[in-house]
């Protein structure tokens, strides 16, 4: 702890950019490295989950990411469930963003588009398209809308439910309605639930005790895109937050005699090196936003914005153009080949090489790799 003033202390925390991986074992061939992981009954060949935003995930994007071994999470409260002509609406949004450099112009239009009511039939049809392709189907809902939307999604045939907000606690209390008790809610479902975001050990442990199969660390923070720090004064030191959640996972494992809850890191991960650092800090998988927005399959055509940007009264994000011109296919973003010397392409290939250089063959072992702090 450090003193920030008389009688007020704060904890020193670390970002992913402040730590480094320390290879200290015999190196291995990257061909011998496995990046597979399993969430409940569902196995994935790569530890990559798409951030649930309309900028990325359409049914077609989710299908392609699933085919490549990852998980695409559809935003259950996004434009896909509100507009039949969602591609036209997004084209209108991108045109507004490109025409006016003032961020509020595009945000106002995004808010207007989100003011349309959710259509369960549209949402169900999107889920059905993903499910029919034979890949794992996951949809994100907010804690506020989980109780009424979940039955619709379960009936449509989802495999995984993601309950995600900027911050999620084990119980959501509201004076204008019934509180959402996640433990009771999850126990009544027949499908696994992933919940988040959390920023510390205590909240992560509380969420694990609700019966969640996975816990999300962070809220998808991205410099220049998410503005939760500016709006709420809340930011996430991802290296520390991931390590804290991993410690909560160990504590819960001991507490329950063997129940393992997966930790998913969501925020400030843009390169293969940052992906590797997130796993090294204790994450089982990462939730990616801007790196995947560069792909040709992304619905936002090179633009990115978080779901929180559409909040009707307090938007916490902006639209940012990530890629211009011809964009690489998702397969190349994840698996290469790459001509980017800064780690923006071949993300999983970079992770494999990092694991091999450090002498580890699987993700859980790699969580034990040595780390140093710079500065």
UniProtKB/Swiss-Prot annotation:
Keyword Hydrolase: no
A Pfam short name: IMPDH
Keywords: NAD, Oxidoreductase
BP terms from Gene Ontology: GTP biosynthetic process
Transmembrane segments: none
EC number of this enzyme: 1.-.-.-
GO MF, one annotated term: oxidoreductase activity
One cellular component (GO) term of this entry: plasma membrane
First-tier enzyme category under EC: oxidoreductase
NCBIfam families per the UniProt record, alphabetical: IMP_DH_rel_2
Family: Belongs to the IMPDH/GMPR family.
Further remark: Was identified as a high-confidence drug target.
Known function: Has no inosine-5'-monophosphate dehydrogenase activity.
Protein's UniProt name: Uncharacterized oxidoreductase Rv3410c
